[in-house]
Structures are given as C-alpha cells and as structure tokens.
Amino acid sequence: MNQVETQKTNGEKRVADVDRKRILVIDDDLPLRGMLAAALRQAGFQVLLASDGGEGHRALTIHRPDVILLDLAMPGINGWDFLQRLKETGFLGTCPIIVLSAHLHVEPQAILQLGASAILPKPFNLPELIDLIEHLSP
C-alpha cells in the first residue's frame, strides 16, 4: 500500500487521501447525502456526491469510485436508469453498487439482476453499511 503521510498544523500525522477508498453517493435527499458524507469521511473514506443518476454517471467516469451507494427513486435519471446506463456503457461490474432505498416494493432479485451488489433498505444501520462497504470494496 502506497501511503503518504502529511503533517497537520498541530503536528499530528495523517494518511493523505491517495489511498483512501472512494465512495460515490448518488441520492436526491440532501440531508441524507450530508449525513452519509460526514459519517463516511469520519470512517476514513473519500466521498463524492451526486443528486441523480446523470451527475453520478459523470462522477463515475471522472473519479472511478471504489463503491457506489445508489438510491433508486430520484428525479431525473433514477437508480434504475443509472444501472441500465452502466450496463449499456460497459461500466457495470467495474465497482460494487449498494442500493439504499425506502422503496423496495420491487423484488430484490430484480435489483440484483440489474447489477447491484447488495441492497440495504432505508432507514439503514450506519455501522452495517460501513461493514458492507469494507466487505465489497477492492
């Protein structure tokens, strides 16, 4: 592992961002995105945020995240369309996708068949989510 240490102003050392796992959060719920960003950063991850599948796809192509957290029900390009777009453009399978959704009335198997690696219903347990990210990420 290639770690680069940097000095903080108070003299503490920390590992620079180059080796932290990059998580892309795609969700239209601004408060939830903020909560996830804060919690994931505190857990040591780099965090990228997108409010819909279109922004998420752009972030994916530019930043190449290690894991994607994806909501299904969003305006614009929703989670279903995002998964389909990944399939069509060849990005499906390049990183694990964890679906986070309060609307799991659809058969979970359909979500997995579209390319999701795992599903967590909202509300979810944050430590469980972090464990799942660690388990699925390269």
What are these regions (language model features)?
Residues 34-42:
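Charged docking surfaces used in two-component/phosphorelay signaling
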Residues 74:
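Receiver (REC) domain active-site loop signature in two-component systems and cognate sites
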Residues 79, 111-120:
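As written
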Residues 124-134:
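C-terminal output helix
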